[in-house]
Curated annotation (Swiss-Prot):
Compartment annotation: Cytoplasm, Cytoskeleton
Chief location category: cytoplasm
Annotated InterPro entries: Beta-thymosin (IPR001152), Beta-thymosin_sf (IPR038386)
Protein name: Thymosin beta-10
Keyword field: Actin-binding, Cytoplasm, Cytoskeleton
Organism: Torpedo marmorata
UniProt keyword Cytoplasm present: yes
Described purpose of this protein according to its UniProt entry: Plays an important role in the organization of the cytoskeleton. Binds to and sequesters actin monomers (G actin) and therefore inhibits actin polymerization.
Source taxonomy: Eukaryota, Metazoa, Chordata, Craniata, Vertebrata
Length: 44
């Protein structure tokens, strides 16, 4: 059936074909305090 995964392709995967990438700095979520300050600034 088509809904069963084909693990043969995964087992024969060549890791050397992957490209090395530099990780970028992630955007962190604002803290609760920052959100509260922005809400107060918008309402006034």
């Amino acid at each position: 059936m088509a809904d069963k995964p084909d693990f043969g392709e995964v087992a024969s995967f060549d890791k050397s074909k992957l490209k090395k990438t530099d990780t970028e700095v992630k955007n962190t979520l604002p803290t609760k305090e920052t959100i509260d300050q922005e809400k107060k600034a918008e309402s006034s």
